[in-house]
């Protein structure tokens, strides 16, 4: 399962536990980890760290907008990794934050409003690629002339294409095929009565214009 609400899924997990049904969580953790057998996730915190470090190499100072999704642990961790990395650097300022629920349709109007309220935006850190795309569309619709660094997390085909077009600055790569394969392996081992790792964390890398040519633009990793 891939929970939309990391706390709200508790009743379903309890029902599965009661019937001794193994539960494998993929992509984002649940709050009640004792109710699941295996959690397979990207290193979401590190994804945020990588975006922040790249930004700091490109900008000596910045006014930053954050696009979040507080109901998912993965989204929270990505933003936390970013904010922790810049915390001791006063030259990087978070000037606004909006929960977009990870959706392009919510990101676009919220960023349009933020652009109207803030004239000097340097960086937009998005919890995933769809919200980054919404941010880019908002900047375009408002005719925002200043170059803005826009980061996402996913490594989606569309995100990589936008990087090749110099529209998106970077995206921290997820490996959904690896996560899926790990989930199937864990399921077989659980059904066979074998011991399995409680948590599997898959490392991340950052895709930018400097290395995007190393990746397949037509498919996920």
Language-model regions: role of each:
Residues 47-51, 74-92, 106, 110, ...:
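Short, solvent-exposed amphipathic alpha-helices that sit
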Residues 35-39, 68-72, 95-99, 120-122:
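Second-shell loop/turn segments in exported
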Residues 39-64, 76-77, 104-108, 156-159, ...:
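Hydrophobic alpha-helical segments within soluble ligand-binding/sensing domains
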Residues 1-17, 82, 95-96, 101-161:
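Hydrophobic alpha-helical
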Residues 6-46, 57, 63, 154-165, ...:
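Flexible loop/hinge segments that line or gate small-molecule binding clefts
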Residues 85-86, 175-221:
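Hinge/cleft segment of the Venus flytrap/periplasmic-binding protein
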Residues 24, 65, 95, 125, ...:
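Structural detector of well-ordered beta-strand residues that form the stable sheet scaffold
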């Amino acid at each position: 399962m891939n929970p939309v609400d990391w706390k709200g899924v508790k009743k379903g997990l309890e029902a599965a536990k009661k019937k001794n049904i193994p539960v494998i969580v993929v992509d984002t953790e649940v709050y009640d980890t004792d109710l699941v057998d295996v959690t397979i996730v990207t290193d979401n915190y590190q994804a945020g760290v990588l975006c922040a470090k790249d930004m700091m190499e490109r900008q000596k100072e910045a006014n930053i907008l954050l696009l979040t999704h507080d109901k998912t642990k993965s989204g929270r961790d990505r933003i936390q990794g970013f904010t922790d990395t810049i915390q001791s650097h006063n030259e990087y300022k978070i000037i606004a934050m909006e929960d977009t629920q990870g959706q392009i349709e919510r990101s676009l109007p919220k960023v349009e409003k933020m652009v109207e309220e803030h004239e000097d935006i340097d960086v937009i850190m998005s919890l995933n690629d769809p919200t980054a795309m919404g941010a880019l569309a908002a900047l375009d619709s408002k005719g925002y002339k200043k170059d803005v660094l826009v980061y996402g997390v996913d490594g989606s085909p569309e995100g990589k294409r936008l990087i090749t077009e110099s529209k998106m600055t970077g995206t921290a790569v997820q490996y959904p095929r690896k996560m899926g394969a790990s989930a199937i392996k864990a399921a077989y081992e659980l059904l066979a009565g074998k011991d399995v790792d409680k948590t599997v964390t898959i490392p991340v890398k950052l895709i930018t214009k400097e290395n995007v040519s190393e990746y397949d633009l037509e498919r996920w990793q």
